[in-house]
Amino acid sequence: MLEEPIDALETEFENALNSLEDNQLSKINGQLPEQVHVFPLLRRPFFPGMAAPLVIEPGPFYEVLKVVAKSDHKCVGLVLTRSEQAEIYKVGFSDLYQIGVLARVLRIIPMEQGGAQVILNMERRIKIEKPTSETKTLKANVSYIEDDPILTTELKAYAISILSTIKELLKLNPLFKEELQIFLGHSDFTEPGKLADFAVALTTASREELQDVLETFDIRKRIDKALILLKKELDISILQHNINQKIEATINKSQKDFFLREQLKTIKKELGIERDDKSLDREKFEARLKERVVPSDVMKVITEELEKLSVLDMQSAEYSVVRGYLDWLTTIPWGIYSQENHNLEEAEKILAHDHYGLEDIKQRILEFIGVGKLAKGVRGSIICLVGPPGVGKTSIGKSIARALNRKFYRFSVGGMRDEAEIKGHRRTYVGAMPGKMIQALKYCQTMNPVIMLDEVDKMGKSFQGDPASALLEVLDPEQNAEFLDHYLDVRCNLSEVLFIVTANVLDTIPEPLKDRMDILRLSGYIMQEKLEIAKKYLIPRNRKEMGLKALEVSFTQEALRSIINGYARESGVRNLENLLKKILRKLAVNIVREQEEHDKEQAKKKKSSRSKKPIAFVPTKHSITPSNLKDFLGKPVFTSDRFYERTPVGVCMGLAWTAMGGATLYIESIKVAGEKTVMKLTGQAGDVMKESAEIAWSYVHSSIHKYAPGYTFFEKSQVHIHIPEGATPKDGPSAGITMVTSLLSLILDTPVLDNLGMTGELTLTGRVLPIGGVKEKLVAARRSGLKVLIFPKDNLRDYEELPEYIRKGITVHFVDHYDQVFKISFPNKHQMKLC
């Protein structure tokens, strides 16, 4: 900081500079010092002929400035540092360029925060000859470099070119005009060296480029370098000018549009036809309501919200909330219903056209249509389709909507954990919106659509609520007539909606939810059904999608059977369709290759004899047979469901039912030497199956005297029961009679009847209880080639409901006690010997 008062310093500086006045300037000009103080410059060098300000901060250089101001010559040397990052107070002569300028102090203006602003006039080029002081400040002997005064024709041409370039710059940047006036006051354009220095000083060239010009003493080379830098500056100024023009044009257009809109508003107000955005919003909402029959309680809410909208400021946050709320309220199709199709014959054709089989579901939809026709309208229903993946649960929903002439909306609830997805969010939350039910009505624009809730058995729970519980109100015919969405907060009638729910299993669906649904089971398809589906639906559809024709590609009946048996044994037809697509894609590649080869041959023939007409391409007919199937699909994935062609002792085949459909299940028993009679169970059996094994073990212990009097088996051996495919978890009670039969086969050392399968839950007293999945198990038995089956007697009604083509070719015995199972399993009991 300055120690002396600012006024005193300024007076001192003025007194020191008075020597520049009153004809003493010429005297000083003749007294160029041989030794000067040197001030380092960091950013860019100065050139002779310039006048420029320089800020001197408090410190050593400020003290030097005081000394210079009191000297006779009042001159300092200004030299550029070699590095722009140099520390100004630690710079030595080795850190400076050798060429700089001599600057004369014209005026010193002290600053309040300390230091001073110095107005300098650049006099001459100088060269640092010999440093004389390098302690706190820099001082050196200097020599002066004079320009050659001779003006050649070439230099004159260069000068004219520089002047014309400067004129162009003045047009683009008026700021250069002031600097040009200062130069004209101190210099003459007939001196090309000074003109080059001035031109370079106008540019924004790098410090190294400027220093290079400063160190160029040859006037011809200097003016050439100056012209190059000046041309670069002109190019930059032109580019900057174009950018500014574009920006100004955009701004001016926006301002013009704004003023025109304001004028238009003013004119409309004067004419009485002004309508702002708020009025337009209100008119839009009111226009929607004219097309709808809105319930009175909902209309009351809409009216209140419209009044609130009219008094709110459009810029307020609440305005957008109210506007969004009204948008939803007026978009719901209040009182709008699709005209239903009550023609049974037409509906039956649509359902038959889209899907093969599924008679239970088709019959249920026809019942729905029939009741609607007689009752002049029918309330919505809730149908639950349960079955393994790929059997057509989702696609049948679209067909049902088409058959009823209703709009269709599907969404998956699998993995859903937030009840707000069903019932909506409260309007107080940011980004709130109605639930899926209201969204479905808005999308369909009718109050009686078909809404499908896919994968309802895979819903989850979280701290955000239980979506399954939220569905209780939606799927209850007695409650959904007054469904309340959290966002709308008004009653909405869902009683006309036909809900279709799909699931793979019922076990994970809560009982209250199951109780509200009409459950229809879609069992897996058997061979005959898959063949018909492939021929009538899958092959024609995919052949058309891939641009293939029926004459080009065909499948034999045997090939389709081989695909189903060897590659696609799952209950549905999704994997079967993927395999057919794979075959068709490979055939498409083959046909395209044939066509390319044909085109090449035709092109060659056309070159050799131009007169011949090209022959049209006729693709080779491709027929898929069992012999060439491996070329498309590789080796078969499945060989046989049966481990044994002839059932050995201690082995019995059971029937299982999973989410993927029916399957066969072997129960194997062997005896192991041991001191104690113990039963061991392996094969990833669940808790229920373990209990079934214990029941079977106890039943055999208590009843063996009936089947093999006088046996001593349990006194000698331990028993190990195993369920093959140990990596697959298994559970359920239906293997009870199978386990008993396996144990008795082991004890009696007699195999069970060949091609026999059984299923049924067993009690400790030998009663056989009913099981589930009759159709699925029958399909699995047919796939495995079983000829005789044993089912619980209580499942007879399920069996009789099955189509004849599923029951045909298999003998089924219905039993209610294990004694009957024993007689069927071991028909030659009188020939058995005891072990």
UniProtKB/Swiss-Prot annotation:
Picking any one GO biological process from the record gives: protein quality control for misfolded or incompletely synthesized proteins
Q: Which residues form the active site?
A: S734, K777
Q: Which InterPro entries match?
A: AAA+_ATPase (IPR003593), ATPase_AAA_core (IPR003959), Lon_bac (IPR027543), Lon_bac/euk-typ (IPR004815), Lon_lid (IPR054594), Lon_proteolytic (IPR008269), Lon_Prtase (IPR027065), Lon_prtase_N (IPR003111)
Which top-rank group of organisms is this from? Bacteria
For this protein, the record's SUPFAM superfamilies field holds:
P-loop containing nucleoside triphosphate hydrolases (SSF52540), PUA domain-like (SSF88697), Ribosomal protein S5 domain 2-like (SSF54211)
Database matches in Pfam families: AAA (PF00004), Lon_C (PF05362), Lon_lid (PF22667), LON_substr_bdg (PF02190)
Name where it's found. Cytoplasm
Catalysed reaction(s) here are: Hydrolysis of proteins in presence of ATP
Tell me its family: Belongs to the peptidase S16 family.
Write the protein's name: Lon protease
Q: Where does this protein come from, organism-wise?
A: Protochlamydia amoebophila (strain UWE25)
Identify the taxonomic lineage of the organism of origin.
Bacteria, Pseudomonadati, Chlamydiota, Chlamydiia, Parachlamydiales
Q: Which gene encodes it?
A: lon
